[in-house]
């Protein structure tokens, strides 16, 4: 399994956000097949744990990711920035995460048309922000000048809110 954590690097001040964000992405990717085989492309779920924007619930992150692996999904846990970091930082971090997943879909044997975002409680709010606001003008500067991709590229293919 490919299991690694890294920090999301965004120019928060340039994006109009006063506090520096502290978001991370942790991958839970099943073993990747050799490229000369015709591998099964798995769906992937981006998981946003809840916690009232003051912590990330441990039972809504890794535990859910492992369960999703058992169900045939690859998973990524987005630990978005918490208070005092304010909106739209979490929306930007979710968009960044979707781009990162799509950029790595071929390498991870992920079906690029089956990338879902899920969230619980406050994480459900973050998932809903991107799931319903992927084409928002709020994302224009980030997508055009920082991530260099289209609105459609960060659009989730499905949403699960809990």
Residue locations for each model-derived region?
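N-terminal cap/lid segment of alpha/beta-hydrolase-fold proteins
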Residues: 1-41, 87
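Short amphipathic alpha-helix adjacent to the substrate-entry channel of hydrolases
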Residues: 39, 57-76
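Short beta-strand element of the alpha/beta-hydrolase
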Residues: 41-50
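Catalytic nucleophile-loop/oxyanion-hole region of alpha/beta-hydrolase
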Residues: 56-58, 78-112
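Glycine-rich, phosphate-binding/catalytic loops in enzymes
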Residues: 62-65, 94, 133-136
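Primarily recognizes the serine-hydrolase "nucleophile elbow" in alpha/beta-hydrolase
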Residues: 99-162
């Amino acid at each position: 399994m490919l299991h690694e954590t890294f920090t999301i690097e965004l120019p928060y001040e340039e994006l109009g956000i006063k506090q520096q964000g502290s978001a991370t992405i942790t991958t839970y990717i099943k073993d990747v097949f050799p490229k000369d085989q015709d591998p099964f492309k798995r769906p992937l779920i981006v998981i946003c744990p809840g916690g009232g924007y003051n912590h990330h619930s441990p039972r809504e992150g890794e535990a859910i990711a492992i369960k999703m692996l058992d169900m045939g999904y690859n998973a990524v846990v987005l630990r978005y920035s918490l208070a005092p970091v304010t909106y739209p930082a979490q929306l930007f971090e979710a968009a960044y995460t979707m781009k990162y997943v799509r950029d790595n879909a071929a390498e991870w044997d992920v079906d690029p048309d089956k990338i879902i975002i899920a969230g619980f409680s406050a994480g459900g709010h973050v998932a809903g922000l991107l799931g319903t606001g992927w084409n928002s003008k709020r994302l224009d500067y980030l997508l055009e000048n920082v991530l260099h991709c289209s609105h459609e590229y960060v659009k989730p293919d499905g949403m699960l809110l809990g």
